[in-house]
Each structure stands twice: as structure tokens, then as C-alpha cells.
């Protein structure tokens, strides 16, 4: 019985919200996610929060009276989107800050970012004292992936006395083109120059310099922040991450000291625990999560994180205790049952593992739990129990029946029960006749049994429902190429697939191979070379090598085949081709 409990390091990071490879905010783990902060309520100073100065009442133009009155009635009738459309149009047309402010509040409430951005920009221009409007425009531009424009409003907001979430300005750094990066970097450094005491901006500068692979200057940007506030979470986490990046001996010293100074600060301790887990410091991470549970004994997130760490640390009995405690709390039941199943499977308690997996309901873990339970039943040799297990699962979860049929059939194919798999697909298609995935799966099962008419029938049924399905066009064309002599028909299908998915290596390979069959050798070689450059798979290598060989380019063919066998010595596509052509790799070719 094979051990299916693989390392959970990456899983721990994902489930705990960490990312070990990001170079800009959020770092692993961020004290506050810059992207979500950008969408949150603006953080502004008391000056910015103060009521806006009284302004003269703006008379309503006669042509706006009826639209605005209509908007009022729509608001009373709770037709908010229609009201927003009218209010936005009037606010952008008129010069009335009060109207713009009202429309902006409604746009934010309706989460209409496009209108909210236009209104925030308008309000910032209309009212030179409105810091919140500038902060809102900045946040919405960040969310839209426009940091250069956001920086303009960041500067405006600062000038009006607002506090800004400066690190969020770098959240899209990795996606920026080089010239955009230079512009953003210059603007962020300029903010720091103009507001040298601003801790948020200093942290943004540190993020920037880390992204620029300048760790010493990044740490230098953090030093004044930590000198003024040794417990600043974002600065502590970023400092630790930079130290980790550089392989420093004591990367956690500052945050560890801060936790010691603030033993009841759950947020700080949690970030420290997550940071330790991301660095695979599992023993200390476990201690920190245990301390968090002392502070909040009914916190299911802490229990779950602790259990994952115990699984990773090969402490299955401790993990079982904490996962059961999580179930007793009634929190995260599907995740708890799934990982209980993983633990039992690792302990070779397969009956208990199946029982736990069967209790996982619709969730992120559901389909993997179902697959694992089914594999364990198959490993026991009980095909009847395997099928009954799927019937019971479908009865409990009718909304997932289509996918469950697909998993059942796939697993049967994996153990060469292809005829039984076709029965499952057929039963499923009676219930879901328009399911592309089920019909495609049955087509592949027909091919495995050399039932080419059956395969062709299913693929053509898919194309009847979806004539521009490039995958199916390619599959049918390649099938006709390999199993029939209907090469021109096959070429037409594959050419259409390539029009729909240009540059797709599998389709390039198929088209090159059918052109080879048609005797169009120059075109075949060009297409197969392109496919091989994109995807140096053994099957593509076999095709390209044969096309080169038949074209008289024997030496080039040998180079391709040798390279493929060096990567995969048992590659059947290549070895079968060599055998069929009577070629050995030590063949001497005389030019």
C-alpha cells in the first residue's frame, strides 16, 4: 500500500495565507494585505475626518430637476443601480460637490468601482479639502492595477493631511513593465523625500527596495520605523523576511522580542507563527500556535494551523487530537475530516481514512477526498464497494453528480477496467447528455479499446454542441490521422483547431503529422519543429525525427531522437519509431 501523505509544506503555506516567493507586498505573511487595505475604508487623520467646510448651495439647473427627482424616487423604491446611473451622470455633469459625494457613497455601497473611481476623481478636483476623495481614488486605482495614477492621488491625499496605505502602491509591481516600474519607483522615493517621517511611506520604500533586490537599503528604510515603534507589525515582518532572504543567522530576533514584549497581542503572535511556518521552523511555529490557543481556546483557525504543522512534523497522534477538537467545536468540519483521512491513511488505518473522507461535504477538499476514498477501496480489490461508494456519495451530493461520475470512470480506466468505465460514462450521459467532459472521457475510453467509430461518434456529438471546441477538433483530427487514411478530412479539422488556438503545441504537432501523412514534408517539418521547441515531448520528438529522416535529414533526426531519449530513456514513442524504421542511434550517416 503506497503512502499518499506527501509533504504538506506548500499546503501549510497556502492554507495559512502565506507566500514564500512574493517579492512585494504582501510578504509572507503580511500584517495587513495591501490589496485588501486598498479596498477598505480610507485611513485618514483627524484633520481629514473633520466635516468639510460649509460651501454655498449650488442651484440645480432646470434640466437636472426631473432626473434628480427621478433618482430620489428610485432610491425610495430601492432600485439603487438605476438611481446610481442617474446620480453619476448628473454629478459628473454638474459642479456640485455635495451631489458628487452622495453619488460616490452610493457607488461604493454598490461596489461599482468604475463609477466610484470617476466620482472620486471628480470630487477630489471639486473640493480641494477632501482628503477622503483622494484616498478613495488612490485605492480604486491600485485595485485597477494603475499604480502610477494612484501615486498622483497618494500625493494629493498626503498634502491634504490623510494617512495613506503606501505599501499597497506596490501590490502590482511584478506585473509592471520596466518603464512603469521606474516611474513608480521614482514616485515612491519622491514621497519618502517629501514626507521623511511617514512610517507608511518608509515601509513602502522598504518593499520597493526589496523588490529591486537591494536588501541593505530596504533594511535601512525600516530602521527609523522600528526605532520609533519597535512593535510595528508590517516593519517587523518585512525586516524578518528580508533577513530570511539573505540567509541571516537570526532573522526572527526583532519580531521574537516584540512578541515577548506583547505576550497578549494575538495579531502579532499569529503573524510570527505564520512566518515561522513559512520558513519551515515547525517546532517554534507549533509553540506559537499553542500559545495562541491558550489565549483563544475556541479559535478553530489556530487549531487547524496547529494540526497542519503537526502533520508536517510527522506528529500524527497530536494532529488527530487537534482535528477532533476542531470537529468538536463545529468549525471547519470538511477540512478537519479531510486531514483526519490523510492522517489515518498515513498510519495505514485505511478503514478509518475512508470513513473520514466519506464525511467531507461539498468544499475545496471534496473531490480529492472522494478520489482518495475510492482509490483506497480499489486498493483493497473490492470493485463492488468502490462503485457503491460512488453511488452513496452521489446520493448525498446530487449537485456534484456529474463530476463524481467522471472521477469514477477515470479511476476505472486507470486500473484498465475500460469497458466498465464506458458503462459509467454511458449511465452518466443519460442524466447529463450535454456534458462535454463526460462525452470526451467516453471518447478517450473508446479509443483505448480501439473502438474508433465510438470515439468519433462522441467527438462529433461534442462538435455538434460546440463547433469551435479546439481541443475536440484536434482530438478528432489526430484520431483520423492515426487510425484511418482520411488524412485530408483530418487536416481540415486540425487546421480549424489551430485557427482557434494559434501556437498550441499539441495542435501544431497534430497538423505537422497529418501533413507528413499527406506528403507535405517541408510544411510538416516546420510545424513539428515549432511544436518541439514549445513542448519537447517524446511523441513530438518521434514525429519530428521521422519527418526529418524521411526528408533526407538523417543526422538532424538522430540528434532529435538522442536528445529525447537522454531526457526519457524508455520513451516508447521514440523507441517504437526507431524499431519501425530499422534505425539505431549509433547509425552512421554519410553526407
Task: Give the positions of each predicted feature.
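Post-signal peptide N-terminal segment of mature Sec-exported envelope proteins
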Residues: 27-62
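Alpha-solenoid helical repeat scaffolds
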Residues: 55-76, 83-591
Amino acid at each position: 500500500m503506497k503512502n499518499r501523505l506527501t509533504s504538506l509544506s506548500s499546503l501549510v503555506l497556502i492554507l495559512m495565507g502565506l507566500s514564500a516567493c512574493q517579492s512585494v507586498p504582501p510578504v509572507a505573511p503580511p500584517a495587513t494585505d495591501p490589496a485588501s487595505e486598498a479596498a477598505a475604508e480610507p485611513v485618514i487623520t483627524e484633520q481629514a475626518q473633520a466635516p468639510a467646510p460649509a460651501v454655498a448651495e449650488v442651484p440645480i439647473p432646470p434640466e437636472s430637476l426631473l432626473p434628480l427627482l427621478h433618482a430620489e424616487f428610485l432610491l425610495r423604491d430601492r432600485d439603487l443601480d438605476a438611481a446610481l446611473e442617474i446620480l453619476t451622470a448628473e454629478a459628473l455633469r454638474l459642479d456640485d460637490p455635495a451631489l458628487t459625494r452622495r453619488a460616490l457613497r452610493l457607488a461604493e455601497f454598490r461596489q461599482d468601482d468604475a463609477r466610484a473611481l470617476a466620482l472620486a476623481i471628480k470630487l477630489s478636483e471639486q473640493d480641494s479639502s477632501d482628503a477622503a476623495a483622494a484616498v478613495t481614488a488612490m485605492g480604486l486605482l491600485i485595485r485597477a492595477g494603475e499604480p502610477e495614477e494612484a501615486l498622483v492621488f497618494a500625493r494629493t491625499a498626503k498634502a491634504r493631511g490623510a494617512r495613506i496605505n503606501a505599501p499597497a502602491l506596490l501590490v502590482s509591481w511584478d506585473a509592471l513593465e520596466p518603464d512603469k516600474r521606474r516611474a513608480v519607483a521614482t514616485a515612491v522615493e519622491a514621497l519618502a523625500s517629501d514626507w521623511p517621517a511617514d512610517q507608511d511611506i518608509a515601509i513602502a520604500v522598504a518593499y520597493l527596495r526589496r523588490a529591486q533586490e537591494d536588501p541593505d537599503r530596504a533594511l535601512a528604510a525600516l530602521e527609523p520605523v522600528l526605532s520609533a515603534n519597535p512593535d510595528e507589525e508590517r516593519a517587523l515582518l518585512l525586516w524578518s523576511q528580508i533577513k530570511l532572504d539573505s540567509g541571516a543567522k537570526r532573522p526572527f530576533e526583532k519580531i521574537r522580542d516584540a512578541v515577548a514584549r506583547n505576550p497578549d497581542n494575538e495579531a502579532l503572535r499569529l503573524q510570527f507563527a505564520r512566518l515561522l511556518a513559512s520558513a519551515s521552523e515547525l517546532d517554534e511555529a507549533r509553540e506559537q500556535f499553542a500559545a495562541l490557543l491558550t489565549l483563544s481556546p475556541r479559535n478553530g483557525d489556530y487549531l487547524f494551523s496547529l494540526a497542519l504543522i503537526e502533520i508536517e512534523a510527522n506528529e500524527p497522534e497530536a494532529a488527530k487530537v487537534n482535528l477532533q477538537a476542531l470537529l468538536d467545536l463545529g468549525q471547519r468540519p470538511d477540512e478537519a475530516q479531510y486531514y483526519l483521512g490523510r492522517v489515518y491513511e498515513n498510519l495505514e488505518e485505511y478503514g478509518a481514512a475512508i470513513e473520514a473522507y466519506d464525511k467531507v461535504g461539498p468544499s475545496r477538499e471534496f473531490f480529492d477526498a472522494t478520489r482518495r476514498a475510492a482509490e483506497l477501496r480499489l486498493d483493497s480489490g473490492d470493485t463492488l464497494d468502490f462503485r457503491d461508494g460512488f453511488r452513496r456519495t452521489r446520493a448525498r451530493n446530487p449537485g456534484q453528480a456529474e463530476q463524481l461520475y467522471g472521477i469514477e470512470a477515470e479511476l476505472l480506466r486507470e486500473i484498465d477496467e475500460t469497458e466498465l468505465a464506458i458503462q459509467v460514462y454511458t449511465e452518466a450521459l443519460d442524466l447529463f447528455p450535454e456534458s462535454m467532459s463526460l462525452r470526451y472521457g467516453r471518447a478517450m475510453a473508446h479509443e483505448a479499446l480501439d473502438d474508433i467509430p465510438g470515439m468519433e461518434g462522441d467527438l462529433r456529438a461534442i462538435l455538434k454542441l460546440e463547433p469551435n471546441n479546439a481541443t475536440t477538433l484536434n482530438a478528432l483530427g489526430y484520431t483520423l490521422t492515426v487510425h484511418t487514411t482520411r488524412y485530408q478530412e483530418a487536416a481540415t479539422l486540425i487546421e480549424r483547431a489551430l485557427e482557434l488556438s494559434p501556437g498550441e503545441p499539441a495542435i501544431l504537432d497534430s497538423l505537422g503529422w497529418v501533413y507528413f501523412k499527406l506528403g507535405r514534408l517541408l510544411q510538416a517539418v516546420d510545424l513539428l519543429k515549432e511544436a518541439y521547441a514549445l513542448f519537447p515531448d517524446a511523441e513530438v520528438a518521434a514525429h519530428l525525427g521521422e519527418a526529418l529522416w524521411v526528408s533526407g535529414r538523417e543526422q538532424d533526426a538522430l540528434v532529435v531522437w538522442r536528445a529525447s531519449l537522454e531526457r526519457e530513456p524508455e520513451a516508447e514513442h521514440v523507441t517504437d519509431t526507431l524499431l519501425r524504421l530499422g534505425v539505431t542511434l549509433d547509425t552512421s550517416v554519410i553526407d
